[in-house]
A protein has these predicted regions:
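Amidase signature
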Residues: 1-6, 169-262
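Short, well-ordered alpha-helical
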Residues: 1-40, 68-70, 182, 193, ...
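Conserved hydrophobic/aromatic pocket- or pore-lining residues that grip, position, or stack substrates
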Residues: 13, 19, 51, 79, ...
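Glycine-rich beta-alpha junction loops
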Residues: 20-22, 115-117, 162, 206-210, ...
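Short beta-strands and strand-loop turn motifs
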Residues: 27-31, 60-61, 147-148, 203-206
Length: 262
């Protein structure tokens, strides 16, 4: 015991995991592929280095499909990663391992990546938080950068306080990532609202990307909207789908980046 907690780093002693797509100096980085199962990088990515500097302790790497190329988490190297709530179902992907680790309490923080939903999709499937940060907010310099500037370092946690603290530790400009040169954003938690929550507004988008959704999910989401309204929140429904033009174009561009680098 130091006797002076204020003198300790912000994340002193906090265990964290890292998606096996990001380089770590003391653990192999396979990118989910048997071709790289023994690859040992000689240094951490910037985000991991900053977490260590903040006192956090890396406890392991989490599973990803090969080269993070799909929204399920399985590979010949690590087998099938299963949903912690129902092992007959998938946790989603490609950061399925990160979200399972966070959801099951392996650690309060899981560092992941997100290009087209890789941190957000499994977060939804596992019932935790998933944040894809603005490009450059957290430096992302490591190979395989196969999704171009669509991909970013992301965060998966159970609690918003952990998400804020980890973002602040990893964020900021770094010379290895030119997109981060103007990154100055730090997060803070707003004080708990006093009195009625009706000052809070929520945007509800019933359809996103023109994709079909299971009726059971739609029913549950609509019930959530109703519950929020009864609690006093203002819920505004979007009249248009911001991704309706053609999300397939974005996926084609990401696939082209992948094919050019693998």
């Amino acid at each position: 015991s130091t006797g002076d907690s204020a003198a300790l780093p912000a994340l002193f002693g906090v265990p964290f995991s890292v998606k096996d797509l990001l380089n770590t100096r003391d653990m192999c980085t396979s990118y989910g592929s048997r071709s790289f199962q023994h690859y040992q990088p000689d240094k951490d990515v910037v985000a991991v280095s900053r977490l260590r500097a903040a006192g956090a302790i890396l406890i392991g790497k989490t599973t990803t499909p090969e080269f993070a190329a799909k929204v399920l988490t399985d590979s010949e190297l690590t087998g099938i990663t299963r949903n912690p709530w129902d092992t007959q179902r998938s946790p989603g992907g490609s950061s399925g391992g990160a979200c399972v680790a966070a959801a099951t309490g392996v650690g309060p923080l899981a560092v992941s990546t997100d290009g087209g939903g890789s941190a957000r999709i499994p977060a939804a499937a596992c019932g935790i938080l998933g944040l894809k940060v603005t490009m450059g907010a957290i430096p992302h310099e490591s190979w395989p950068f196969h999704y171009g500037n669509n991909s970013s370092i992301s965060i998966n946690c159970r609690h918003i306080e952990d998400l804020v603290a980890s973002f602040n530790a990893m964020s900021g400009a770094h010379t290895l990532d030119p997109w981060s040169r103007r990154a100055t954003t730090k997060l803070s938690l707003a004080p708990s609202p006093q009195g009625s929550p009706n000052r809070k507004k929520i945007l509800f988008i019933p359809a996103l990307g023109g994709q079909p959704c299971d009726q059971k999910i739609l029913t549950l989401v609509q019930q959530t909207v109703t519950d929020l309204q009864r609690a006093g929140y203002q819920v505004d429904q979007a009249n248009s789908d911001p991704l309706a033009s053609d999300p397939g174009i974005a996926m084609q561009l990401m696939a082209a980046n992948l094919a050019a680098r693998v």
